[in-house]
Amino acid sequence: NGGDTFITRANPSLTAIGALGIHKAGHLQVYAPITNENIYTNLWKGPFYGFERAIETFELTNAPRRIKPVGIYYHTYSASKPAGLKALHKVYGWALAQPLHPVFTSEFIAKVQDFHGLALAREGEGWRVRGSGALRTLRLPTVLGAAQPERSRGVAGWSEGPEGTYAHLTGGQAWLRAAPMQTPAAPALRDANARITHWDMQAQGGEFQLQGHGPLEFSLHLPSPCQVRAHQRTLAPQSSPTPTRTDIRHFRLNDVTARIQIHCPAR
């Protein structure tokens, strides 16, 4: 609870975004990502459809930089008013249409704890990262470019953002090297709605494992001759999420966990 993040288009100020948590007596109290329907509805005095503005909060805490996750937080009495119930349907419908990585609240808490204790240090031509392994995504400012998975350790890939790139780590320890954005020379992860539990990749291919809470979706930076397999069958890519980038291919599986192989014939 707490934090009361309530940024909206009517009040698009960073001062309306609460912290991830607060230290008290040697402990870290983790706040809810955003406030609940009470604030959006003037302490449940109306308008009872006010919680639909949580969508504005989700959008404004994701761009131009990701500050908070999508956390749908409300009391069950929200469904006691038709307008409140309609607002819930609208918020859930919006969330289901987004490319999100679902996690339990307990997993989010672990990520916030890792955020507060993560260590970053310059080491040689890269950056040393040490944490608990709960937090797996780091935002690199534009000046650093993008992670180079093939020249790093503990880095699975990266994705673009409006204010930099996001590096995907495979665990709590990594050495990350960055350079101006370019197509990876070896297979790399662009995004996924699940957690990486295993990653072993070379220029000729390799394998990785994803563990999620729903049907798996993931995108890969892939050289054109590479094939992707799971459950002893070749996976057919879905329509590209970025039509102008032929090296990016998107895949879907009905499983919540899968070990995926990539094979790249010699060129």
Stretch-by-stretch model annotation:
Residues 6, 68-72, 206-208:
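Hydrophobic beta-strand segments of well-ordered beta-sheets in folded domains
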Residues 13, 77-79, 134, 215:
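Short, glycine-/Ser/Thr-/acidic-enriched flexible segments
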Residues 3, 8-12, 73-76, 104-107, ...:
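Active-site proximal loops enriched in glycine and acidic residues that flank catalytic Cys/His/Asp
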Residues 1-30, 84-85, 258-259, 265:
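Catalytic domains of cell-wall/extracellular-matrix polysaccharide-remodeling enzymes
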Residues 6, 14-17, 51, 81, ...:
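Extended hydrophobic/Leu-rich segments
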Residues 34-110:
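Catalytic grooves of carbohydrate-active enzymes
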Residues 20-53, 86, 106-126, 130-143:
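C-terminal regions of proteins
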Residues 94, 99-267:
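Non-catalytic C-terminal accessory domains or segments of carbohydrate-active enzymes
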